[in-house]
Amino acid sequence: MEPIEDLDVLAEDEVRQREADGEVDEDLDRVKHGYDATAGDKQVYIETYGCQMNVNDSGIVASVLEESGYGLTRDQAAADVVLLNTCAIRENAERKIRARLSMLRSEKEKRDGELMLGVLGCMAERLREKLLEQEDLVDVVVGPDAYRDLPQLLYEADATGQAAVNVELSKQETYEDIQPVRYDSNGVSAYVSIMRGCDNMCTFCVVPFTRGREESRPVTTILSEVARLAEEGYKEVTLLGQNVNSYHYTDADGTSVSFAELVDRVSRVSPEMRVRYSTSHPKDCTDDLLKVHRDRPNVCNYIHLPVQHGNTEVLDRMRRTYTREEYLALTERAKELCPGVSLSTDLIAGFCGETEAQHEDTLSLMEEVRYDHAYMFKYSERPQTYAARKYEDDVPEDTKQRRLEEIIELQNQHAKESNEAEVGRVHTVLVEGPSKKSDAQFFGRTDTNKGVVFDREDYEKGDYVRVRIEDCTSSTLLGTAIEKTTLEAAARTDSITTSPAVA
């Protein structure tokens, strides 16, 4: 997934720049959930690492525990149970979680065994034996498909003093009947899980081994959740799945719903609610889906299309199922059907066997597409994957690092030029909350997923505001508010075509 928009995340220098600008999102590499403390015999504190799906899963965990009488707290010191919802997508993520467990070990010792620790999610599924053998401080180890059993597992671990484990993957579990606790206190944007698992088996990716096979959630439960969020005042939903655009559900009466049809139906729940999704696979990005972007004004004009690499031979080794030429044709089709569309991607430097010429192909593809955003990484070998079993991780670390830095440098240049081109244009911005630099300013996003800062004046969180872009940094647009609007009104009046800048 997008490195949570899939975060998972950004290249380190882009994070530093966005932090310097004061507009970097909450670092989803580690999210301390801001649950309000609730009554309960035992208090639970949850930390989440990784992608948007993990964030949503933590909301499911919170809901399950509340139903069983647990309280939720934002104060770790007040917690009887600390749960780490983990990510296994890269080695660095696992190192961070191990370091966090080491810190918690000393705290557990200080509390003389009164603190229970749990490891949830992808790392729990992948490393269950090592967690139990090497991290003997862990009381529960629970995989992504076993969260309904968490209250019972906590009870068993507490009663017996022995670690309780359930990491079984399920072909049916979608948690369709559970409403996640919305830890995001802004009340503006919410995640809605529509499917789980992945069937693609890319050679570098551990997700199919930690999340299991694809299982789509019933359409009716998705639409009900979105409708409930609209009633609660949310203005944006992001549909989530490991491979979200492979969504396909068949009702008991035989009626089949594709992802394009689902997005269209979600967009009709409330014309004043923006719709996004993450993360998609290029092979499943159809004309029907692109036409929904074009025809439905509240479906954001932003598509995440992870290419991973710019060379066809490397893409074949990655088992991505498309060629460089096919991918480029898709991006051209997206730009043709959806004028002004913003494209983002994932890029891996130094995959097994990558030559200098193949690396140059990635750079040249970037020049052709000119992404607005990118999530960029060095290749990190993951156990269990086909690449770990069959390919040699033969690109030296210093070469990987140098190639990654070249990718980052080029992407930063493209992002800067893209933002500079926005000066003088008017965008509809959804206000997410105060700017991190100043309470006198608001921060929000365009439907092309660009961050915008402007003086807050009399506007409120959750408003749609027409903003003229006056200036920019490499990561943020700076604007002047024109007026409050609605999505329906903006569809008639807003434009992303260049207009004269205010003198």
Curated annotation (Swiss-Prot):
Q: Where is the MTTase N-terminal domain?
A: 42-159
Where is the protein localized? Cytoplasm
Residues recorded as binding [4Fe-4S] cluster 2, renumbered to this chain, are 198, 202, 205
Q: Which CDD domains match?
A: Radical_SAM
The protein's Enzyme Commission number: 2.8.4.3
Show where the TRAM domain sits: 420-483
Write the record's keywords in alphabetical order, separated by commas.
Answer: 4Fe-4S, Cytoplasm, Iron, Iron-sulfur, Metal-binding, S-adenosyl-L-methionine, Transferase, tRNA processing
Residues that coordinate or bind [4Fe-4S] cluster 1: 51, 87, 122
Stretches assigned to the Radical SAM core domain:
184-417
InterPro entries named in the record? Elp3/MiaA/NifB-like_rSAM, Methylthiotransferase, Methylthiotransferase_CS, Methylthiotransferase_N, Methylthiotransferase_N_sf, MiaB_methiolase, rSAM, rSAM_horseshoe
What would you give as a GO molecular function for this chain, any one?
Answer: N6-isopentenyladenosine methylthiotransferase activity
EC class (word): transferase
Recite the UniProt cofactor note for this protein.
Answer: Binds 2 [4Fe-4S] clusters. One cluster is coordinated with 3 cysteines and an exchangeable S-adenosyl-L-methionine.
SMART domains per the UniProt record, alphabetical: Elp3 (SM00729)
Q: Name one GO cellular component term.
A: cytosol
Q: Which cofactor does it need?
A: [4Fe-4S] cluster
Q: Which family does it belong to?
A: Belongs to the methylthiotransferase family. MiaB subfamily.
Q: How does it assemble?
A: Monomer.
**Could you tell me what this protein does?**
Catalyzes the methylthiolation of N6-(dimethylallyl)adenosine (i(6)A), leading to the formation of 2-methylthio-N6-(dimethylallyl)adenosine (ms(2)i(6)A) at position 37 in tRNAs that read codons beginning with uridine.
From the Swiss-Prot or TrEMBL record, give the protein name.
tRNA-2-methylthio-N(6)-dimethylallyladenosine synthase
Q: Which organism is it from?
A: Salinibacter ruber (strain DSM 13855 / M31)
